[in-house]
Amino acid sequence: MNTLVALPAGSPAGVLQTILASNPAIQPRVIIDGLGAVIEAPTPVVAALSAFPGVAAAVTGALPAGLPVNPVLQPWIDAWNKQFDPAYQASLAARPAKWLTTGNPPPGASGTPAPPTSTLDGTVAFGLVTVNGPAAAALSPSDVIDINLGVLNAIGHLTRNAPDAARLVFVIEWQPVTLVGVVDPLSIPGPIPNSTFDDQENREKQWRDPALAAIGQPAGFPGVTNYRNALLGRTWWGGVHADKSIVGFVSRYNTAMSAYAAMGRLVVNLPQTDVFPGRIHIDRVVAHEMCHLFEAQDEYDGCAPFVMSGPFHAVNGNCISNPLATLGQAPCLMAGTSDDLCNWTKAHVGWQPFP
């Protein structure tokens, strides 16, 4: 049962470490820096945590208002609470398992695999950079809530599918950036069919590099790498250290594609995602792109059927163009037909050899 353990503002990092170590039945899934953790634990353990010294709340439902938590992190609380909103739950229940609803997704529906970040296991640090801007690039409060909820649910898909041996835990550092008087949204060209790396970079760098500067990092991919190293070098709430790190940029600034991932970072353009596959699928988009950063391959039309990925050098056997798929393509996150990972993708991200 997923439970959010929230701590009061200003709590020492060691408080969460004590909580996580207090019972072997507690399985952390996500640690949100400065707020607390999403854990899995039996109901009696959750009840005991509510009375644990230094805990503001331990809930399996919505957090009550008025808790003494860090107000800067209220969007994470709002995101958690939105899961329990009846209208949101109805939208989730109504969405189809197949979220890429065309035979060949329009340009920008996904990205390309990155050089290996390493296997998707251990403690993964995720630096989430939301880039707000003026006019058309302005992120509304509801946008930020939806982004944060999308990240939480994306991680939920991955940790639910991961084997126990992977010991997969995500730690999140949120960097909300607002660019003022730096980048005119109208100066950045819009999406382009069949975009190249240069097309993507020429658009992205115009707002990404100022965002990197705002968080104290150099421009370009050296800045992304530097930030990833900083995520690896710090101590997180709960006393944990990350084994690997990735960065995510989410914005309304124009990009060449709606979502893509390479070189240790993923990029999501909110307006394009709203058009396809839709805001309600943002968790699937984020999870899909995260998997790309750990060598997972696309499996829909246009995929590469015989490319080998991951530590087990598994071919892309669930690619719709692979002869093996004529026997029936398995539902899979990388095919856009499921929230779950097929056995081929599990091999690509390093969880198990196929099958």
Where are these regions (language model features)?
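Propeptide-to-catalytic entry region of secreted or membrane-anchored zinc metalloproteases
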Residues: G111-V240
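Loop/turn elements at helix/coil->beta-strand transitions in domains of secreted/extracellular proteins
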Residues: G122-G127, A242-V247, G264-V267, Q297, ...
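Active-site-proximal beta-strand/loop segments in catalytic clefts of secreted hydrolases
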Residues: V129-P134, F249-T255, Q272-T273, A296, ...
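Catalytic zinc-binding patch centered on the HExxH motif and its immediate surroundings
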Residues: R252-V267, C319-I320
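Short pre-active-site segment immediately N-terminal to the catalytic Zn-binding motif
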Residues: L266-A287
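Active-site recognition of the HExxH zinc-binding catalytic motif
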Residues: R284-E299
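Autoinhibitory N-terminal propeptides
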Residues: M1-A37, T43-P113
